[in-house]
Design a protein with these regions (language model features):
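Conserved beta-strand positions in repeat-built beta-propeller and related beta-rich domains
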Residues: 27, 34-39, 71, 79-83, ...
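Hydrophobic, aromatic-enriched interface-forming segments
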Residues: 120-165
Length: 219
């Protein structure tokens, strides 16, 4: 697999609090993007050149946000909060939190609880995306170990979990396995696959929901 850089746009805007952009999601008609910054209690809407639309961005009573995804008809946003390892549903019309679902409150959490120390470390949930074919939600745990976790559409049940490990192709020539991180997720409906990005590895990987690696490329 080969990736080609088409354009690059700066989106960091410290004046607006967008200091550490984390996660990116495209709206249904492809006209705008949403992102979060883990040190700012806000949802930011951007145009396709990375410029923040102040009137369409809004504050929210949550911090430590690390990933974001639009769901359904663009009426709600799903964001992950790393510190609590929760999925938060935000109503885009009212700009308010609709619900908050910690992984620890979901059915089958006992099968992955040993991967999440208490109190939480800084290696929790980092990315989120929605499978638009069945509305299942995927979240990714950053590292130690990296986990790909599939949730049902109601965010009440953990359906499956896969450890992202060397035997599945998740390796980097310059990083030990325990140092490789997983920073973001995106679902590709055209091929029914997931894209996983690694910050430390500087790579983007294409995988199935069962964490079978198709291909990987440096970015």
């Amino acid at each position: 697999m080969r990736l080609e850089l088409l354009h690059r746009h700066r989106i960091r805007d410290s004046g607006l609090g967008l200091n550490e952009p984390s996660g990116l999601t495209l709206n249904a008609d492809g006209s705008a993007l949403y992102t979060v910054s883990d040190d700012t209690k806000a949802i930011f809407r951007l145009d396709l050149k990375g410029r923040v639309s102040v009137s369409d961005s809004f504050f929210i009573s949550l911090d430590d946000l690390e990933g974001i995804a639009l769901r359904g008809d663009d009426s709600e946003l799903l964001v992950v909060q790393e510190g609590s390892n929760s999925v938060v549903v935000v109503d885009l019309n009212t700009r308010r939190e609709r619900s908050r679902r910690p992984l620890s409150a979901m059915t089958n959490y006992d099968t992955i609880a040993h991967h999440f120390p208490d109190p939480p470390d800084n290696n929790g949930l980092e990315g989120i995306t929605v499978n638009t074919r069945n509305n299942h939600v995927f979240v990714v745990k950053e590292c130690q170990p990296g986990l790909l976790i599939e949730l049902d559409s109601t965010l009440t049940t953990i359906l499956s979990t896969r450890v992202l490990q060397p035997s599945q192709g998740f390796i980097h020539p310059e990083l030990k396995a325990e140092k490789l991180d997983f920073s973001g997720l995106s679902y590709d409906s055209s091929s029914d696959t997931l894209w996983i990005v690694s910050d430390r590895g500087g790579a983007c990987s294409s995988t199935t929901g069962q964490a079978t690696l198709f291909s990987s490329a440096s970015i």
